Amino acid sequence: MRFVLINIFTFLSLAFISQNDSITDTLKKKQKTVDLMEVIIYTPKDNSFGISRLKNVEGTAIYAGKKTEAIYVGDLNANLAANNSRQVFAKVAGINIFENDGSGSQIGIGGRGLNPNRISNFNTRQNGYDISADALGYPESYYTPPTEAIERIEILRGAASLQYGTQFGGMINYKFNDAPTNKIISGNFRQTGASFGFLNSFNQLAGSAGKISYNAFYQYKHYDGWRDNSTLNYHNAFGSVKYKVNSRLSIKGDYTFLNYISQQPGGLTDKQFRDDPYQVTRNRNWFKVNWNLYSVVVDYEINQRTKLNFIAFGLMAGRDALGHLGRPDRVDDTSKYRNLLSDVYNNYGSEIRLLRRYSFLNYQSNVLIGARAYKGSTVRKQGDADKTSRANFSFMNPNDPENSSYLFPSSNYAVFVENIFQFTKNWSITPGVRFENITTSSEGYYRLVNRDLAGNVLLDMRMPDNRSNSRSFVLAGIGTQYKIKTNYEFYANFSQNYRSINFNDMRVNNPNYQVDPNLKDETGFTADGGFRGVVKDLLYFDVSAFLLQYNNRIGTILTTDTLTYNVIRYRTNVSNSRNLGVEAFTEIDWIKLFSKESKHKFSTFVNFSFINAIYTGGQQPAFENKKVEYVPDMIVRTGITYAYKKFSVTGQYAYTSEQFSDATNAVSSSSAIYGIIPAYSVIDVSAGYSWKYFGVFAGVNNVTNSLYFTRRTEGYPGPGILPADPMNGYVTLQFKF
């Protein structure tokens, strides 16, 4: 199959590159028209609000007719040291956030009614390449790029499936700041102190000399936490070297290192949360992450009309979760062994893209063709660890773990084509198609233990479990946009989506949680349309509606364990679901409205989303018309910013309506692993001032000290309710040259 795909791509590439000179002649004859088309394309940053859209064509990617956002970090007042998602993503409509990690070591966001857990419903990238544990089998992101290093965060919704793969949520790309071309050396040193023993040191050097440019940073974090047993020690480093061979060819290599260890205080029951959200239920739970990312990027401008981009990337990483997974209403018996879940990831892949401009009906159009090859290998073990409270991530029997031992190999080969057909100066249509071949397998065993009511072992067997599933399919989509003048446009898109089952959906040993052994892949589509526009530094808006159809949706229901008779969460293909929603964002500078030359800025923004997400029938008709879990009906974020020269201050209010944590829509439970998540609201204030090489930034998050939670979990870092951070403050000192 891989040779067929490579041959298809090679044939298409050569066909486009070897076109005769008639296209060139046509372009020359229509040069005036082509120039006009270039003028109306948005600049990379069309306002100072910190939010924009992506251009129709960015490098070798096509975004015309798609719902996109670009967050410009440098324009934000936010707690960047802690990667505060509530502030960083405040202007992105429809984003639901897990807020249980005050250090920012991991973030969880979901869009349009998709689960926020570790951004697993987005294809997550850094500088254009994958960063998740396994893009197919385990698309969770244990590594979060430091916001202080980022130029912008690029977001593409469900239409991303054609260019970036099969995730329903779309694609998120963290694009780091480029090295300055006019300095041999530049530096950015930011030191942050905050509540609960939080320390963050971010140190960056970058520059250019001749044909070589470089960018490197090191970040250290320490966090004691607002609950006991929450200590974090965190090390993150990045290095990049780019060699510009000539004016048309460049080669860049990136390396990212991450290592951290954190203690986890465990989850709470509803009663424990009401009585004292500061209390802890665990002192033996720990979590460790080790991440190594590497990539090589080649950009080649073949001629004025043709660009080629090639990326090779790899991941060598691991994560270990250690502790006691029992219900939070049960005491951790320190006389018993702890449980260790250990993963080792070794993945590598490559992507190649060819973008060509050509004349169509006397207007400039663009065609993009690309291919992807990816191989993943995950070793997952679960078994007993020692009885202590130390961070000792070692199995008692490493060669024969008590619960399970698996190898999860995976592979993915794909080719895709998208084309912007520019029919008039203002109207374009962008169809696309993607062919996918996916193989996921499991090779290993799990241990089956049955006990009687007295706890005596009746059956203890080692069960071999070897499975393999290979499938090929085609995804198609089409988008359109129509411009009104230069700065306003209507857009609409329809794209098919697909999501394969992941490793967690195959086997996990957890007393609170079981998995259906007959799970099926998820399919569906995303349709959206809207109206957006910008008036530079005065007004930006984007109003849209969407429909997300999700078939064979995997979710959690409540059932009774046939052996223990305890109520547990059971992961299965619950049903089909339908997410229907409206997303709206607008920001206006009221001073610029009356005085365009004023140095003062006084802007307000409103970010609103309404989502109706219900199960609509399928494998489990009993859940028809039940609400989909982790989908609040309403999310509102609004804020106000005042700025004058190098000083700015922002106040922000965020409201999220209530949501359920499982497909049965249970309101409460004694174990707290399922139940309702009540509505909550939070206020944040941040300010900053810069003078020459120096800057000071400060703020208070959760100003009113709201006590709330956004997540219930059946496993680590719980199980149970995971409380959000109370009121906390921070101060950052910056030296930048």
Write out the residue ranges for each language-model feature.
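Membrane-embedded beta-barrel scaffold of Gram-negative outer-membrane proteins
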Residues: 297-323, 483, 489-495, 499, ...
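C-terminal beta-signal and adjacent terminal beta-strands/loops
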Residues: 551, 601-604, 655-667, 688-737
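Gram-negative outer-membrane beta-barrel transporters
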Residues: 437, 546-549, 566-665, 704, ...
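Face-selective signature of the C-terminal outer-membrane beta-barrel domain
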Residues: 247-258, 289-449, 483, 542-545, ...
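Short acidic/polar hinge/loop motifs at secondary-structure boundaries
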Residues: 129-157
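Short strand-turn segments of transmembrane beta-barrel domains in outer membranes
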Residues: 159-161, 171-207, 218, 225-226, ...
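Transmembrane beta-barrel wall of Gram-negative outer-membrane proteins
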Residues: 193-222, 227-263, 286-303, 434
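Extracytoplasmic beta-strand/coil segments of soluble accessory domains associated
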Residues: 58-60, 69-74, 78-129, 133
